[in-house]
Amino acid sequence: MLDYTEAGTILHSLMIVEHTVSNNGSFSAIRMRRMRRDEFSRRLMRENHLRVDDLIYPMFVIEGENQREAVPSMPGIERVSIDQLLIEAGQCVQLGIPAIALFPVAGEAKKSDDAAEAYNPDGLAQRAVRALKQSHPDLGVITDVALDPFTSHGQDGLIDDTGYVLNDETVDVLVKQALSHAEAGADIVAPSDMMDGRIGAIREALEAGGFIHTRILAYSAKYASLS
């Protein structure tokens, strides 16, 4: 049976042959279309293979019970209450989707200048995470670490009297938010803000809090997602 080492050697040889210069005339023998001609060679040469294992399902959660709201800018996507969230999460498990990305939609009454609701242990995101991990413990839960859902002004950070976003003060709140997610059971926290130094601060706080297995997802790895 052909092992992976031998298969890799053969594939490498194919690539070398494709880069050989032809002696028949002046036209180069580098014709990349050759390897795209047949299905078998396209399969051998393709860089990416999208499978269910590669999927993360975005879910937007709102307060209430038995609530579903369409998101006009994303046809087919809905904001759902926690009870409906659990139903959809169960469908994700049945389909083999390994993880969901959770985005809370806070009501206006929950928003403030200091975004304190972001790290409320009984906040919407935190309750949703606990419910998900209790109902579907093997489903990965990724949470969004950002303040814009919770600030009255809509900025992704704390601001001063001139509207300038305060970096270090914002990082302190982001750390509290990430810790509250980890305490609720989040497997991965994903900071989507743009504050300098927040990754190191979050990692340090997670380690100090004993959440050594909580991972941090860079949004640079998430650029092609729906969310």
Per-region residue spans from a language model:
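Short, positively charged and aromatic/hydrophobic N-terminal segments
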Residues: 3-4, 9-19
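N-terminal amphipathic alpha-helix/helix-capping segment at the start of soluble metabolic enzymes
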Residues: 18-62, 67
